[in-house]
């Protein structure tokens, strides 16, 4: 519920609705081939030198950014925002179909040379179990100052090695008296930004308003991503 408001956008419709909701998607799942090999994201819009991309189990054709259905996209300042789906009703079942659709959508997406995809996953490690991360260039882990978050950060390093992805860390809500402890709990050589504890960030997020604050660490992070 927070990402679109933090970006100053409207809430996008769930992409799951493109397939008739969870019910329609599950029907397609049952009718689809049980196993299909994909190459993942085709960078630069080309698969030259690679085996031909196989047809998706769920999409009629491969998509580029220009093929994204506009009714499921919010856009501002050149940034497109999409949402796969959420649990909206009590007792509707697990979120597994959302994980499947996320992976299939990413595998079906062709990228131009200037295109960049950022996937905001749920907190925790479940997306690794679903294989969502397998074609990512890098993984950014936001680490909060909590025991659970610091312990999980070590697990992300392990998963990154298993899926062949580089893992970097963003320390969040950093205060001077806990900074060293947070750095000691992660692979400090891969810390690319330290976001300070700022009351105005908390209050803006609490009210669901757009985050338009100027932070040097965010600029540093953006520059790191640009060069990566």
Question: For each predicted feature, which ranges?
Answer:
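Phosphate-binding/switch loop-helix module in NTP-utilizing enzymes
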Residues: 45-125
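Short, small-residue-enriched loops and turns at beta-alpha junctions
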Residues: 22-25, 34, 89-90, 125, ...
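Short, glycine/acidic-enriched capping/hinge loops at junctions between secondary-structure elements
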Residues: 4-7, 93-95, 205
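Structural signal for conserved beta-strand scaffold positions within catalytic alpha/beta enzyme cores
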Residues: 17, 81-83, 141, 193-196
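N-terminal phosphate/diphosphate-binding loop that engages ATP/GTP or pyrophosphate donors
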Residues: 1-77
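C-terminal alpha-helix
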Residues: 217-228
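C-terminal boundary of histidine-terminating zinc-finger modules
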Residues: 205-215
């Amino acid at each position: 519920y927070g990402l679109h408001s933090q970006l100053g956008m409207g809430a996008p419709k769930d992409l799951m609705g493109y397939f008739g909701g969870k019910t329609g998607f599950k029907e397609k799942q049952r009718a689809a081939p049980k196993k299909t090999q994909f190459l993942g994201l085709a960078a630069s819009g080309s698969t030259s030198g690679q085996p031909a991309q196989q047809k998706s189990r769920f999409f009629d054709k491969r998509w580029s950014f220009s093929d994204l259905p506009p009714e499921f996209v919010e856009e501002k300042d050149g940034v497109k925002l999409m949402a796969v789906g959420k649990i909206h009703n009590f007792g509707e079942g697990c979120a597994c179909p959302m994980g499947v659709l996320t992976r299939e959508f990413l595998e079906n997406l062709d990228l131009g040379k200037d295109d960049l995809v950022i996937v905001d996953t749920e907190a925790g490690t479940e997306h690794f179990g679903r294989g969502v991360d397998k074609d990512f260039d890098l993984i950014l882990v936001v680490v909060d100052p909590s025991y659970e978050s610091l312990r999980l950060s070590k697990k992300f390093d392990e998963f990154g090695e298993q899926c062949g992805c580089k893992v970097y860390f963003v320390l969040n809500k950093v205060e001077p008296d806990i900074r060293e402890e947070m750095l000691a709990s992660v692979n400090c050589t891969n810390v690319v930004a330290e976001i300070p504890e700022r009351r105005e960030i908390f209050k803006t997020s609490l009210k669901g308003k757009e985050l338009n604050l100027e932070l040097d660490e965010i600029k540093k992070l953006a520059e790191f991503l640009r060069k990566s």
